């Protein structure tokens, strides 16, 4: 897709979004739900970024990392993610043995500069919505709840992913990329708060952050929001959509517990399997807000 067509699609999406925001009256005490992208709304298992991290290390430095190592810092901005992978004891030891020095910023820049073009090409292959995600989002919109979003992807990747997701029916009211703001991304609250500003939200306590990574949940806490962690559709379980649908109860229980042990470290208000389970949480938070409770 060339840049002119891409820009036209993004402009059309933004025009539609602004009209929707202005014409919708909220029937809920919840003002906005802010979603992560990969592993939350699209890309079941969050495979697009992780597989490209593995490929980027291999291509740039002939250095092997495992998919599991690539998953550990998920949720951070991608430059920070590469840095965090390099600091993993297992990776740092192998890097020192192979190159005789620790990974430095120049190395991270090289890997990042390899990662971005690869990710732009392949992100559209992972733009399929997670089961029932579009229905859940559209039902929230019908209630007058605004849909925000933010991602660990930089804007260059989001400019490819946004129109691909739109073709599949996902049209958030706001999209913030990890390099849109000068102060950096997660776990700081800047991207979530940028959504608050752009959406015209009156109180962060009336917002919910939904994410499949601990930095994303910490982002929500730091922004003063309710937080909902996803266990089975995201990075920590690492299942494909097909594996999830075909898995036995035992397999799902094992994957759920594995993810729960990681995600509970960020103290989410709620832990659910996938976005399909979100409506019940929405109702509970609505009742808590009506009673005067806050995150």
From Swiss-Prot:
Recorded GO CC terms: cytosol
Record Gene3D superfamilies: HAD superfamily/HAD-like, Putative phosphatase, domain 2
Gene: phnX
Catalytic activity: phosphonoacetaldehyde + H2O = acetaldehyde + phosphate + H(+)
Keywords: Hydrolase, Magnesium, Metal-binding, Schiff base
Note on cofactor: Binds 1 Mg(2+) ion per subunit.
Protein name (Swiss-Prot/TrEMBL): Phosphonoacetaldehyde hydrolase
Gene Ontology biological-process entries: DNA repair; organic phosphonate catabolic process
Keyword Iron-sulfur in annotation: no
Single GO MF descriptor: phosphoglycolate phosphatase activity
EC number assigned by the record: 3.11.1.1
Annotated residues for binding of Mg(2+): 36, 38, 212
Entry coiled-coil feature ranges: none
């Amino acid at each position: 897709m060339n840049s002119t067509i891409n820009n036209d699609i993004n402009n059309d999406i933004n025009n539609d979004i602004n009209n929707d925001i202005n014409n919708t009256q909220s029937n809920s005490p919840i003002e906005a739900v802010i979603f992560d992208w990969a592993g939350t709304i699209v890309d079941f298992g969050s495979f697009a970024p992780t597989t490209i991290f593995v490929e980027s290390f291999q291509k740039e430095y002939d250095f092997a990392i495992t998919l599991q190592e690539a998953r550990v810092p998920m949720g951070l901005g991608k430059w920070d993610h590469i840095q965090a992978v390099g600091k993993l004891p297992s990776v740092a030891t192998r890097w020192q043995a192979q190159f005789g020095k620790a990974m430095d910023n120049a190395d991270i820049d090289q890997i990042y500069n390899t990662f971005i073009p690869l990710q732009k090409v392949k992100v559209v292959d992972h733009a399929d919505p997670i089961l029932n995600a579009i229905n859940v989002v559209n039902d929230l919109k019908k209630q007058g709840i605004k849909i925000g979003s933010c991602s660990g992807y930089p804007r260059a990747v989001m400019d490819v992913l946004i129109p691909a997701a739109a073709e599949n029916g996902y049209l958030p009211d706001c999209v913030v990329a990890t390099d849109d703001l000068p102060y950096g991304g997660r776990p700081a609250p800047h991207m979530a708060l940028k959504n608050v500003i752009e959406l015209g939200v009156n109180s962060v306590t009336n917002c919910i952050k939904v994410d499949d990574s601990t930095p994303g949940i910490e982002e929500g806490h730091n922004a003063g929001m309710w937080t909902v962690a996803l266990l089975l559709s995201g990075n920590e379980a690492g299942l494909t959509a097909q594996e999830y649908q075909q898995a036995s109860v035992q397999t799902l229980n094992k994957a759920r517990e594995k993810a729960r042990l990681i995600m509970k470290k960020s103290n989410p208000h709620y832990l659910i399997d996938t976005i399909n389970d979100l409506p019940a949480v929405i109702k509970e938070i609505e009742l808590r807000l009506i009673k005067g409770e806050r995150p």
